[in-house]
């Protein structure tokens, strides 16, 4: 018989599977292009004629190119081979206008060898900005001495305080170029809209050809590579890299660039957009496809775990066999981790689930301590419920475990905080405080899970653990291991993902060691409920 709860879960899983199948179909439509089947209305590739080409890169402060005397040639590749990969670093002169928060443009021409680009009717070109505007990243200093080793901080101190919050010109030190090299014959009646805007057609006799498709990979421009342009800067390095690209990958890359641009138009910051760029640029397409499925299932398991966890705690009235200290610690550590990720401006893919988890942990503390809120006018009054004899027995085991842990934990946390204050630079005292807390959580947080393990050991049972929610969270633990290598996140948060694997294995061992026993508790704070004694039968 289907219950309302199981029907809702089945509906969510069903919608999720439909979404995954639909997304796979859409992705297939992006990377696959139907070739021209007949002779009429076909558009042939100009590269199939094997013309001798030349690549030229110019810089100018003007957004539109008027005459050749307004540009500076920074790179000239004669006898350019579209199949040969290369990378070259050149020094670019920075005009005074650009040093004063102006913009510098790069014009990239692909034209016939031996002919100037503006004299070649069969040339193709693209334009890219070499500068962008961003608020400078706050400099980290030694909080005790106030020392900072960078010249950027010295110049920043000379500026008025309100000027530090204003966007300034930053240099993009990388320019990544691609040419689509597939000898693909397009159907003129069904040109893909994404590629069409990059195509330039010419008529050669009775045949229509499309010129080489030149593409700038904007996803390779990362925030971490940007350099502040100072007024004293006269030259800056620019790395120009080239590689061929297939039609399927080109179409996929165009869609990804458009998606990132759309997110920025909807209010996503440059930092959040940069995290998405990192996923695309730093991984190959096969790992990227795996990432999509991993992310989709991570969201599904997050939802199911939150739903199961909330449902279990909503019905909970007893804390027998459950470590209250572990619940309080999980709440504290989850909130600290959320504040830390917020301070580090971590990707929203990591930040939002952490925020939801922190809210749930706060609610679980209210249930664990049996807190009720009564209002006397505008003043809230907090009342705590009473504990049964069995709950007091659990608290005894809990306090015993915490006593031994405190001898080890507190000196380690205090020592780590003092060491980081003396040797590591931070943006502010708040940043140091949050980092000290979160490093304690990440490095020694697993110790706070020991009281629950100790309670399980003393009571010789884990049967009351909500294994459904626990299983969902365990799946996400292994998924987090994959994300630890893909999504940009603080190193300490990355290491904590692998620490959770150890905790999961310990609980599996306890489940095997203490088979079915309905008088035990779980790692997430769930425990069995005390069953009221039934009255004896009259007979």
Curated annotation (Swiss-Prot):
Keyword Iron-sulfur assigned: no
Extracellular side: 32-285, 343-403, 451-539
Membrane topology listed for this record: Multi-pass membrane protein
Keywords: Apoptosis, Endoplasmic reticulum, Glycoprotein, Lipid transport, Membrane, Transmembrane, Transmembrane helix, Transport
Cytoplasmic side: 1-10, 307-325, 425-429
Major localisation: endoplasmic reticulum
Catalytic activity annotation: a 6-(alpha-D-glucosaminyl)-1-(1,2-diacyl-sn-glycero-3-phospho)-1D-myo-inositol(in) = a 6-(alpha-D-glucosaminyl)-1-(1,2-diacyl-sn-glycero-3-phospho)-1D-myo-inositol(out); 6-(alpha-D-glucosaminyl)-(1-octadecanoyl,2-(9Z)-octadecenoyl-sn-glycero-3-phospho)-1D-myo-inositol(in) = 6-(alpha-D-glucosaminyl)-(1-octadecanoyl,2-(9Z)-octadecenoyl-sn-glycero-3-phospho)-1D-myo-inositol(out); a 1,2-diacyl-sn-glycero-3-phospho-(1D-myo-inositol)(in) = a 1,2-diacyl-sn-glycero-3-phospho-(1D-myo-inositol)(out); a 1,2-diacyl-sn-glycero-3-phosphocholine(in) = a 1,2-diacyl-sn-glycero-3-phosphocholine(out)
GO CC annotations, alphabetized: endoplasmic reticulum membrane
Residues that carry a glycan: 91, 101
Function: Scramblase that mediates the translocation of glucosaminylphosphatidylinositol (alpha-D-GlcN-(1-6)-(1,2-diacyl-sn-glycero-3-phospho)-1D-myo-inositol, GlcN-PI) across the endoplasmic reticulum (ER) membrane, from the cytosolic leaflet to the luminal leaflet of the ER membrane, where it participates in the biosynthesis of glycosylphosphatidylinositol (GPI). GPI is a lipid glycoconjugate involved in post-translational modification of proteins.
Protein name: Lipid scramblase CLPTM1L
Gene: Clptm1l
């Amino acid at each position: 018989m289907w219950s309302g709860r199981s029907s809702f879960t089945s509906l969510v899983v069903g919608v999720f599977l439909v979404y995954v199948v639909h997304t796979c179909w859409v992705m297939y439509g992006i990377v696959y292009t139907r070739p021209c089947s007949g002779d009429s209305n076909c558009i042939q590739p100009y590269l199939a004629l094997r013309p001798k080409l030349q690549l030229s890169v110019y810089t100018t402060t003007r957004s539109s190119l008027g005459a050749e005397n307004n540009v500076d040639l920074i790179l000239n590749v004669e006898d350019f081979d579209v199949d040969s990969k290369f990378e070259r670093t050149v020094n670019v002169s920075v005009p005074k206008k650009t040093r004063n928060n102006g913009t510098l443009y790069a014009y990239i021409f692909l034209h016939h060898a031996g002919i100037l680009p503006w004299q070649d009717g069969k040339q193709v070109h693209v334009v890219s900005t070499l500068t962008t505007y961003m608020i400078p990243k706050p400099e980290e200093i030694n909080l005790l001495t106030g020392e900072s080793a960078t010249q950027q901080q010295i110049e920043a101190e000379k500026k008025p305080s309100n000027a530090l919050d204003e966007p300034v010109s930053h240099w993009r030190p990388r320019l990544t170029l691609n040419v689509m090299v597939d000898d693909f014959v397009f159907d003129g009646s069904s040109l893909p809209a994404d590629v069409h805007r990059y195509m330039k057609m010419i008529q050669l006799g009775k045949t229509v050809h499309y010129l080489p498709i030149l593409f700038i990979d904007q996803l390779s421009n990362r925030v971490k590579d940007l350099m502040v342009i100072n007024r004293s800067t006269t030259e800056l390095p620019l790395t120009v890299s080239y590689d061929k690209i297939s039609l399927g990958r080109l179409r996929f890359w165009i869609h990804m660039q458009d998606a990132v641009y759309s997110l920025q138009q909807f209010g996503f910051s440059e930092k959040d957009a940069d995290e998405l760029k990192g996923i695309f640029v730093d991984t190959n397409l096969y790992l990227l496809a795996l990432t999509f499925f991993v992310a989709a299932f991570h969201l599904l398991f997050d939802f199911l775990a939150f739903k199961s966890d909330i449902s279990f705690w909503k019905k909970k009235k007893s804390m027998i066999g459950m470590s209250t200290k572990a619940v309080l610690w999980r709440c504290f550590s989850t909130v600290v981790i959320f504040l830390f990720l917020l301070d580090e401006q971590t990707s929203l893919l990591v930040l939002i689930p952490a925020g939801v988890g922190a809210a749930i942990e706060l609610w679980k503390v209210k249930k664990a301590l049996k807190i009720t809120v009564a209002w006397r006018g505008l003043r809230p009054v907090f009342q705590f419920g009473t504990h049964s004899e069995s709950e007091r027995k659990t608290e005894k085991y809990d306090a015993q475990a915490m006593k031994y842990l405190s001898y080890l934990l507190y000196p380690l946390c205090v020592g780590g905080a003092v060491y980081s204050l003396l040797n590591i630079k931070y943006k502010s005292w708040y940043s140091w405080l949050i980092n000290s807390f979160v490093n304690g959580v990440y490095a020694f947080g697993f110790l706070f899970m020991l009281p629950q393990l100790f309670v399980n050991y003393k009571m010789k049972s884990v049967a009351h653990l909500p294994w459904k929610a626990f299983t969902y969270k365990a799946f996400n633990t292994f998924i987090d291991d994959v994300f630890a290598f893909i999504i940009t996140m603080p190193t300490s948060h990355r290491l904590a993902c692998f620490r959770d694997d150890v905790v999961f294995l310990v609980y599996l061992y306890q489940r095997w060691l203490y088979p079915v026993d309905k008088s035990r508790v779980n790692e997430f704070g769930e425990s069995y409920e005390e069953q009221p004694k039934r009255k004896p039968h009259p007979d």
